Each structure stands twice: as C-alpha cells, then as structure tokens.
Amino acid sequence: KLDSALNIANKALEADSTNIMFQYAKSTILLNTGHYDECIKLCQKLIEKDDSLAEAYYNIGLAYFNQAIELDKVQQKSRDKRKRIMTLYKESLPYLEKYRLLAPEQKAQWVSPLYTIYLNLNMGKEFDEIDKIKNEYRNNHR
C-alpha cells in the first residue's frame, strides 16, 4: 500500500513539483517505508523554503530517531554501533525540539521521542521536564 501511495505522491509531484503538501506527503511515505535519507533530504528542502513547517522538522527528527531505535534493537552492540546510535539521537534532537516549539499541542507526537532521546543522552534537566510532561499527558489521556 505504501508503494502505491509513493507512486501517487510522485505522480502528483510530476503535475506540480512545487506543491508543499505533495512534497510533505512524499516525505511522510518515505519515513514510513524506512527511506530515511530520502525523507531527510526532502524535508531539508522544505525547511529551506519555509522554516515554519513543523511537520518537516518532525519527519527529519523521526527519521534520525527511528534509525537509532532500529540500531538499538540489535542484540550485539559494538562500541561503534553505540556511538552511531548516540549520533543519531543527537541529530534527531534539534528537529524534534523545533517541532515541539512549532506544535506544542502535538504532545502525543513529540513527548515519547524526546523522552527517549533525553534519557539516552543523559540530559538530566531536560529529562526531568519531559518526564513530568509525559506523566501529566498520560494521566490526562487515560
């Protein structure tokens, strides 16, 4: 289904290559199909055109975050792999923090990734803050 969605997005972009909504849709499909590098490049182009596009920051942040999570699931973690995971979390961080600033009402989307990043990067003050927000959110949405 996602392949056909990608085909539709590509056809829409053939008709109107400058349409931001079509480009954003394609970036989301790329994110959901694990084409992280392509997603990042497309979203960076979107941000260059309009740096207030919250969802573009979210997609880039999740592209880096998802790569870190996938690497973290591997049983045998070498020192190099652990370093790569930390690098991916660090690359994800500014995009997810920017998304949080641009879309504060979207807690369901940014709270868990930021929680995980702050925890793994040992960011005590930020972790304490996000832990409180996460607990409040969870208590209000039961």
Where are these regions (language model features)?
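Canonical positions in the second alpha-helix
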Residues: 12, 45-46, 98-99, 134
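Structural marker of alpha-solenoid helical repeat scaffolds
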Residues: 15, 49, 102-103, 137
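Residue-level recognition of tetratricopeptide repeat
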Residues: 19, 53, 106-107
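TPR alpha-solenoid repeat register
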Residues: 22, 56, 109-110
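Structural register within alpha-helical repeat arrays
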Residues: 26, 60, 67, 113-114
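Short coil/turn linking the two alpha-helices of tandem helical-hairpin repeats
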Residues: 32-34, 61, 66-77, 120-124
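Short coil/linker segments at helix-helix boundaries
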Residues: 65-98
